[in-house]
């Protein structure tokens, strides 16, 4: 009986470990008006923003949509991450948004932390009416919702703070995936 409990406990431990996602937030571009950060999953070589663009190489069926997103990123880089540039996708107050604001086949998800700080996640083809119904998009948005919650908590307890366009403090996170 004791042996069985150990096996079950070990199996539960392995299961829990396999459902844990480690990642960080890294600065990827500095502009006069805003800094762009991106989620970087621990096991991946590229940031989530880079992985998004890798999915849609030049000459793909979504060139026009990618051009629209790039135009928005250029505009945000020049003017800042103003609220009117984003389509809100998360819960009230979490800052989770999508680019572009106009109708498009693609969504790039991000956290608008302020007019001066934007944190990118990943995104993809809008294959359902809402991100909650999409297997691929829901994973990206849920990661950002959790990240927003982690950042808010750290800002509140003083282990993370914002100075102008910089996020200062521990930008490493561990997330239990909800599968």
Predicted feature locations:
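Acidic/polar active-site rim loop that often engages polyanionic ligands
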Residues: 121-126
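Short, surface-exposed charged micro-motifs
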Residues: 107-109
């Amino acid at each position: 009986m004791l042996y069985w409990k150990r096996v079950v406990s070990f199996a539960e431990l392995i299961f829990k470990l396999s459902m844990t996602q480690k990642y960080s937030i890294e600065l990827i571009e500095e502009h006069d008006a805003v800094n762009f950060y991106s989620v970087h999953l621990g096991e991946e070589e590229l940031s989530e923003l880079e992985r998004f663009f890798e999915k849609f190489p030049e000459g793909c069926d979504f060139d026009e949509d990618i051009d629209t997103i790039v135009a928005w990123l250029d505009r945000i880089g020049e003017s800042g991450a103003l609220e009117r540039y984003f389509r809100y996708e998360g819960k009230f107050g979490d800052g989770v948004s999508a680019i572009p604001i106009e109708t498009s086949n693609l969504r790039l998800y991000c956290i608008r932390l302020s007019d001066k700080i934007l944190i990118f996640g990943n995104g993809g083809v809008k294959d359902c009416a809402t991100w909650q119904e999409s297997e691929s998009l829901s994973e990206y948005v849920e990661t950002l919702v959790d990240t927003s919650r982690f950042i808010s908590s750290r800002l509140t307890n003083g282990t993370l703070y914002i100075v102008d366009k910089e996020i200062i403090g521990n930008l490493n996170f561990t997330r239990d995936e909800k599968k």
